[in-house]
Amino acid sequence: MASASPRRQDLLDALGIKYKSVPAELDEHFFPGELPRKAAERVAREKAEAVARNFEHGLILAADTIVVCDGKVLGKPQDEDDAFLMLSHLSGKSHEVITAVCIKDIDQAESEVESEVTRVYFRSLSPMEIRTYISSGEAMDKAGAYGIQGLGSVFVERIDGCYFNVVGLPISRVYGMLARRGTNILRNE
């Protein structure tokens, strides 16, 4: 897996998938005018390709998650002030969480990229709630500056779509992509 994300690791561990975590050393930038979904897909592919250079065989799983609100892409916050601005922007609104997944089959020299979109609805947040949340430390390593699986869950009124996508890995989609490559995680082999 081309990621050091503890949330993605937890999800794969829960499914019993054996993997090696190798973070991709990559500048996750977006090009001017690039559509958010296409940008996330490109970054996921670049992560998979960067990590694949270190292996001769196997499958590489890479993902990139972004948050989009009012047309603005929110990645991981640079600092606490940036996190405050992001959460203030999300307050009382809905936004999209886009996770792009790339599976690179080194043996077949093929890559497959898909993405999942989940709409998340935030309640209105007070500045004090935002500051308290940021002081927990949870905001700093997550796209959009919140984690739906932790304290950030108190901000969420509802979601439309895949919960695991918001966590960082759309499990059902990953299952389908792996199954098409001959890897059935439901078998005990």
UniProtKB/Swiss-Prot annotation:
Tell me the domain of life.
Answer: Bacteria
- GO CC terms, sorted: cytoplasm
Its annotated function is as follows: Nucleoside triphosphate pyrophosphatase that hydrolyzes dTTP and UTP. May have a dual role in cell division arrest and in preventing the incorporation of modified nucleotides into cellular nucleic acids.
Q: What organism is the protein native to?
A: Syntrophomonas wolfei subsp. wolfei (strain DSM 2245B / Goettingen)
Catalysis: reaction(s): dTTP + H2O = dTMP + diphosphate + H(+); UTP + H2O = UMP + diphosphate + H(+)
- Site (Important for substrate specificity): residue numbering on this chain: 7, 65, 149
Q: Which cofactor does it need?
A: a divalent metal cation
The active-site annotation reads 64 (proton acceptor)
**Higher taxonomy:** Bacteria, Bacillati, Bacillota, Clostridia, Eubacteriales
PANTHER family associated with the record: BIFUNCTIONAL DTTP/UTP PYROPHOSPHATASE/METHYLTRANSFERASE PROTEIN-RELATED, BIFUNCTIONAL DTTP_UTP PYROPHOSPHATASE_METHYLTRANSFERASE PROTEIN-RELATED
Q: Name one GO molecular function term.
A: UTP diphosphatase activity
Q: Which HAMAP family match?
A: Maf (MF_00528)
Q: Which UniProt keywords apply?
A: Cytoplasm, Hydrolase, Nucleotide metabolism
Q: Which Gene3D superfamilies match?
A: 3.90.950.10
A Pfam family recorded for this sequence: Maf
Q: What class of enzyme is it?
A: hydrolase
UniProt-annotated location(s): Cytoplasm
Primary location class: cytoplasm
Enzyme Commission number, as recorded: 3.6.1.9
Q: Which InterPro entries match?
A: ITPase-like_fam, Maf-like
Q: What is this protein called?
A: dTTP/UTP pyrophosphatase
User: According to its UniProt record, which protein family does this protein belong to?
Assistant: Belongs to the Maf family. YhdE subfamily.
- TM region positions: none
Gene Ontology BP term (one): nucleotide metabolic process
